[in-house]
Amino acid sequence: MHVKKKLISLMLALGLLGGTQTAFAAEAAPEAEPLPAWSYGMLADGYSLGLFGDEIYTQHSQTVTTEQLDTMTKVVADKLALLEMETRPAADEGLVIDTTRGGVVNALYQEAAAYAFPGIEAGAEEFMTSVGALAGDGSSLRLEEPCTLLEAAAMADSLILNLYDQQNAGSLGLLWKADNGEGNTLYLLGSIHTDVNNTYPFHKQLRDIILNADQVTFELDFNDQAQIAEFAAMQVYSDGTTLADHVSPELYQATVKVAAQLGMDEQAIAQYKAWALATSLQSLATLDETTSSNAMAVDLYVNAKAANAGIPIDAVETYAFQGGIFDNLSPEYQETYLASGLLMAVDVNTVDQETRDALVAVLGEEALEPATQEAIQAQVDQISAMMETWKNRDVAGFEKIYDKEAILESDDELNSKLFIDLDPGMIQYAADYLSQEGSHTGLMVVGAGHMVGDTGIVQGLIDQGYTVEVVPNP
């Protein structure tokens, strides 16, 4: 519940489409200091790993605090444990841990020294230097100087990435390569719009493909502030009405109660449309204990990585187009959608009677039965299973879990629209990129569901004569 409380206001704005801003905020953010150019390359990785949050923009030149260092060493410890390396006896004798550069080096080295990494016996300075986690100014390592937050974050980030690279580890992603046989290549990365199951770090192969692209294309342009503002406006009522005017009084009160448990007041909730609340509640249900406090979905990470590297960004659709799919859902569907989101957010064994009655009125008595609760948990588990296939580049496994044909054949108003309305335009965009003159290498990042199936991008390009293959695992 702690993670959900922390993220509810953010996710209400992000929803499943991602990249929007919240329509309200508790307070204005402090003015940011310019970051040094050398740090741009590590920001997306450090943020996604949870090494730091937005404080990096205002505190990066300040001496790292003990609490911040503790957070970083915990992240390093958790990530290195996932490599399942052979353990070794503790090697912390004589290591002084403080907030100097040397103290930070020792703290990070101590976490790596729990495992039999090659060269670990050389000691803190030599090992950290050998894996690219420690560098000086050309004359010395400046170990006695205070360590800034940014320096500490860069050390921790480099340590994790280099040790993962050394072990050929990291998330591979559902990745295909399409080419026209005449010099144009388009990598296709199927995204899953969540951050669970230790998504980060990405494997070096995938990070390199991002950084070597001439252009990166997403479903939406996460950097277009005008479009983001337009989408944010679509999520709230602008005709003088509130949520209370569009759903039953009982469902409205149930929504207010659940939102209060997640840290939002009635005034904030009332302005949002039912579909915006529903997508947010269902997204929150997919988060787990592995989700970084920054909860950076795959497409948002790739966007940050590419944008920080100065790579041109493009988009297949507009926020208005995709938002319109949700905005045009029937009132009846939106009410059911919201009730379903609430059902995923509450504990039916402890929820108050009024909320139970409100959910039953919309969803029926079976909504509160054990079988339904088991089905909901199965859906959440399915997200986790899909993420495992994503991390391992198991396309067949993903397609087995994600039955696109069943979705297309269903009478669900939303699911079918998300593919019927979007797949053709995505196929055309990819084909246009591949058919342009010259030699180009691009990366297209859209929902994995759009990649697969008979109507998906991969098959659509094959049908047009392009060569499309799953990228071999490194």
Language model regions located:
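Sec-dependent N-terminal signal peptides of Gram-positive bacterial secreted proteins and lipoproteins
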Residues: 2-25
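Extracytoplasmic Gram-positive cell-surface binding/anchoring modules and repeats
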Residues: 26-77, 86-122, 134-159
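Catalytic cores of RNA-modifying enzymes
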Residues: 171-173
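A recurrent domain-boundary module in secreted/ectodomain proteins
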Residues: 149-166, 469-474
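Extracytoplasmic/secreted envelope proteins and their assembly/folding machinery
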Residues: 40-43, 66, 70-74, 101, ...
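A cross-kingdom marker for long, charged
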Residues: 407-474
